[in-house]
Amino acid sequence: MLYSKENKESYLEPVFGSSAEDRDIPKYTLGKEPLEPRIAYRLVKDELLDEGSARQNLATFCQTYMEDEATKLMSETLEKNAIDKSEYPRTAELENRCVNIIADLWHAPKDQKFMGTSTIGSSEACMLGGMAMKFAWRKRAEKLGLDIYAKKPNLVISSGYQVCWEKFCVYWDIDMRVVPMDKEHMQLNTDQVLDYVDEYTIGVVGILGITYTGRYDDIYALNEKLEEYNSKTDYKVYIHVDAASGGFFTPFVEPDIIWDFRLKNVISINTSGHKYGLVYPGIGWVLWKDESYLPEELIFKVSYLGGEMPTMQINFSRSASHIIGQYYNFLRYGFEGYRTIHQKTSDVAQYLAHAVEQTGYFDIFNDGSHLPIVCYKLKDDANVNWTLYDLADRLQMRGWQVPAYPLPKSLENIIIQRYVCRADLGFNMAEEFIQDFQASIQELNNAHILFHDTQQSGVHGFTH
C-alpha cells in the first residue's frame, strides 16, 4: 500500500499509542502545541471516567435523558444566540410560543396581558421575579407616601426555601423573613404568615415543591390569607410562586390543585424547563399575570445587530438550543404525553416509597403522591448502628447517588434521605435500585465496624 502522508501517526496509530500519551499534558496552563481532535476528545473523556452515572443520580431534579431527535435538534442549534432576535427571528418566535403555551397551562387570564421570558434556569427566573416585586412595591409605597428608606424592604418565605432566594435577598438588600417549618407544618405555615407581613413586604413566596421534601406550600390558603390582609390596607402584598419543580408537573398530574394565575394574588410564577419540563439543563421560565406587575424600568430596549428588542434578563448571550429543545417537547408530547410520562414517574415514586416503608426502618415524609419525591428518616426506635450517611455511602458504592442531609433550621436535628424520580427512572431500574437498597441495609446490619458521623455540618439549601 502506498501512502502520501508522511505523518502516519495521525491515522494509523491508536490514541493510546500516540505521542500525547507519552507525556503529561499540561492541565493548568495551555499546552505548547495543538492536539489532534480525536486525541483531545479521548483525553477529556478519560478525565470524566470516574464520575457517577447521571441516570443513577437520584439527588438531582435536572433532566438526564432526552430523545435522540431532541438531542440532535439541540446539537444542530448550539451556535444560535438566543439574544439575537433580529438574526434568528424564527427562534424568537419559538420562544414566544413557549411563553404562550406556559401561560395557557397556568391559566393566565384572557382579559389581561401576560408577560414572560426564558432564563437559564429557575434561579435566574426567581431573581427576575424578586426584582419585579421589589420595584413594584417601591412604586406603590412611594405613591402612598411611605418612607421607603426608613427600613429595608422584606420578603416572606418558608424555611424550606431554595438557596437562590437567600442570594436574591443578599444581592438586592432585602430582609428575608423566614417562617419556620415544624413537624406539624412541613411547608409554609399559612396560619403564621401574616405575622411576618407589613407595609415593607415586597411579596410572599409560595413554593410548589419544597426542594428538601417535595411537599407543596398551600398556595390557595396563602392567597386567602393575603386577600384578608389586602382588604384592610392600601399596602397590598402579592404572591410569587416558585414552581421550579411543580410548574411542569402539577398541571398534568393534579390539575384540581389551584395554585396558579387563577388565584387573585398570584402575580408571577417561575419554573424550570430542565426539571419536569423534560429538557437538559439549563432552561427556566418566568411569567407575570399582567404587564402591570412588571415595572417598565426593568425592561430594556436593546439595539443589537440591526434590531431593537425588549429584554428582561440578567444574562445576555446564551445558546438558543434549550429553548428549541423545550419547544420540541411541547410539540412532541402535547398535554396527554406530558400527563402520561409524569403519571408513570409518580407511580414509580410511590412504588419506591412503599418498598422503603416495608423494610420497617423508616418514617416516610413524602411518598411521591404529589411531586415524585421519596423522602424519609430513620425511625427513632430503628435500633441500628448505622446512619443515613452510612446508607448513602453504601449506595454510592453501587453507583447510586442518594443524598442524606438535615432539614432546614428549626428542624436541623432531623436527618433525611431523598430520591428524586425523573422520567428516565422506569420500574425496571427502580426494582434494581430497591435490590441494591436492601442489600446495602443488610451489609450495614452485618458490619462489625462502622465509621460514621451522626450529622453533617454546614449543609443547607439547594440550587435549582
UniProtKB/Swiss-Prot annotation:
Its cofactor is pyridoxal 5'-phosphate. GO terms for biological process: glutamate catabolic process. One of its GO terms (molecular function) is aromatic-L-amino-acid decarboxylase activity. InterPro entries: Glutamate_decarboxylase, PyrdxlP-dep_de-COase, PyrdxlP-dep_Trfase, PyrdxlP-dep_Trfase_major. CDD domains: DOPA_deC_like. Transmembrane segments: none annotated. The modification N6-(pyridoxal phosphate)lysine is found at K275. It comes from the Bacteria. Coiled coil: none annotated. Keywords: Decarboxylase, Lyase, Pyridoxal phosphate. GO terms for cellular component: cytosol. Its EC number is 4.1.1.15. It catalyses: L-glutamate + H(+) = 4-aminobutanoate + CO2. Converts internalized glutamate to GABA and increases the internal pH. Involved in glutamate-dependent acid resistance in gastric fluid. NCBIfam families: Glu-decarb-GAD (TIGR01788). Belongs to the group II decarboxylase family. This is Glutamate decarboxylase beta.
